Design a protein with these regions (language model features):
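Conserved nucleotide-sugar phosphate-binding/catalytic loop shared by glycosyltransferases and other
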Residues: 6-14, 32-87, 91-93
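Conserved nucleotide-sugar donor-interacting segment of glycosyltransferase catalytic cores
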Residues: 97-163
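A nucleotide-sugar donor-handling region in carbohydrate enzymes
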Residues: 139-231, 256-259
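Donor-nucleotide binding loops and adjacent catalytic segments primarily
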Residues: 184, 199-293, 345
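A donor-sugar binding/catalytic signature common to diverse glycosyltransferases
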Residues: 283-327
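C-terminal amphipathic helix plus adjacent low-complexity
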Residues: 350-406
Length: 406
């Protein structure tokens, strides 16, 4: 029987400046929690422009904050043409703070950015800490190379602030796969709060109907939001021109692919009889499940879907502005979970075509004895998260006596 938690509330923060990964991860966790506990409500604060394009379960809702986009050089800009970044950030801070004050969450979960975009949630964290709210930081299995992440966090004094505010740090991966904080001067108090949840299992959604129902047996090419995916799509299309016998390929371009590159790719795809392109599908899980192989860049959500549906995969990771995808792909390839191809090797159409042709017959992740022995295929992240949440919400709440001084 599903336990009932009367009027329990969880607020999640997803800064969403590049791609769809943060919102999709928050949504997956939110759906698992409301399924585990009747009476629980989850609100997601999201900055993505297409938050409303996804289906949400009953008792899961979202608050849209003004959108900011991360450029390829790592800088940020407001997506409102006539609003400065500073003004946009101030609006975001105000909405986040007001939502926290009005929603009265029992638990606040931050996705990936400990203090939010440009520190926009620090004031809210201090307020919630003073109210006795349980504060949780959720981190991907891989953040970035320590030589890149370390200086960035040092400038922002992030580790001290994590120690000050957060009660628990979830790592959304299994212990032993990768330590996202490796190489950083992590305080012992922070290390003691870390819990590895395992990867987040994906399933075919029960809500709504898919926008696209291709027959099974296609290669699926996905780069997530698509903001930096043009080079991979060009390489796939060049491979098809070199070898038209690769077979049916479905390319999901992504809603954030720049308009000029989108137009060029759509025009090129029209000349390739075995290539179909779509912009977006909010049920990507169904497309992954039906594919004979998946070609992607190795973002967290795509990787979890590859494992969940046990699809042969070829990963071509990006290396700018972060090394996250490359680190994950190298580790997964080492374990035999995926095949990896450096981006510079895909510029050879013959070599890339051969890799695409071979992909459907490549070993599936479930064939990796090393990963199975280590427990990396358990994919039980949602269950571990739900256990933690249940323990906190069923325990007597102890309000803090004073506000935290930042």
């Amino acid at each position: 029987m599903t336990p009932r938690l009367e009027d329990a509330r969880i607020l999640m923060y997803s800064h969403d400046t590049f791609g769809l990964g943060h919102l999709r991860r928050c949504r997956e966790i939110a759906h698992a929690l409301v399924a585990a506990y009747r009476g629980l409500s989850v609100m997601i604060i999201s900055g993505t422009t297409i938050a409303g394009a996804f289906d949400y379960r009953v008792r899961v809702d979202f608050v849209k904050i003004p959108s900011v986009i991360k450029l390829r050089n790592g800088e940020y800009q407001s997506m409102a043409q006539h609003t400065s970044l500073e003004d946009t950030l101030e609006m975001r801070r105000a909405i986040i703070r007001q939502t926290a004050q009005s929603f009265h969450p029992d638990i606040f979960i931050t996705d990936k950015e400990p203090m939010g975009l440009h520190g926009e949630i620090e004031e809210t964290l201090a307020f919630l800490k003073s109210q006795g709210t349980h504060l949780v930081l959720g981190l991907r299995d891989v953040m970035d190379a320590p030589e890149l992440l370390g200086p960035e966090w040092a400038r922002k004094d992030v580790l001290r602030k994590i120690e000050t505010y957060y009660d628990r740090i979830w790592v959304y991966g299994p212990e032993g796969f990768h330590d996202p904080l490796a190489g950083l001067p992590v305080p012992e108090a922070v290390t003691a709060r870390v819990r590895y949840t395992g990867f987040l299992r994906r399933a075919i959604p029960k809500m709504g109907t898919p926008a696209h129902r291709p027959a099974d047996g296609y290669l699926l090419v996905t780069t997530g939001g698509g903001g930096d995916g043009a080079d991979l799509f060009r390489a796939v299309f060049a491979a098809h021109r070199h070898d038209p016998g690769i077979g049916r390929t479905l390319a999901v371009l992504g809603p954030y692919l720049p308009a000029r590159e989108r137009a060029e790719l759509l025009a090129e795809a029209e000349t390739l009889p075995n290539v179909e392109t779509i912009e977006f599908d909010n049920r990507l899980e169904e497309l992954v499940a039906g594919a004979s192989g998946v070609v992607g860049m190795g973002g967290y959500n795509t990787f979890c879907e590859i494992l969940s549906f046990d699809r042969p995969a070829l990963i071509v990771p990006r290396t700018q502005p972060r090394l996250e995808q490359a680190i994950r792909a190298e580790r997964a390839a080492e374990l035999g979970l995926v095949r990896m191809m450096p981006a510079e090797d895909t510029v050879d159409p013959a070599a890339f075509a051969a890799a695409l042709r071979a992909l459907p017959d490549a070993p599936r992740p479930s064939k990796s004895r090393a990963a199975a022995k280590a427990g990396f295929m358990a994919l039980d992240g949602q269950a571990q998260i739900a256990r933690d949440v249940g323990e906190w919400l069923m325990a007597p709440r102890q309000p803090a006596l004073r506000a935290v001084q930042s």
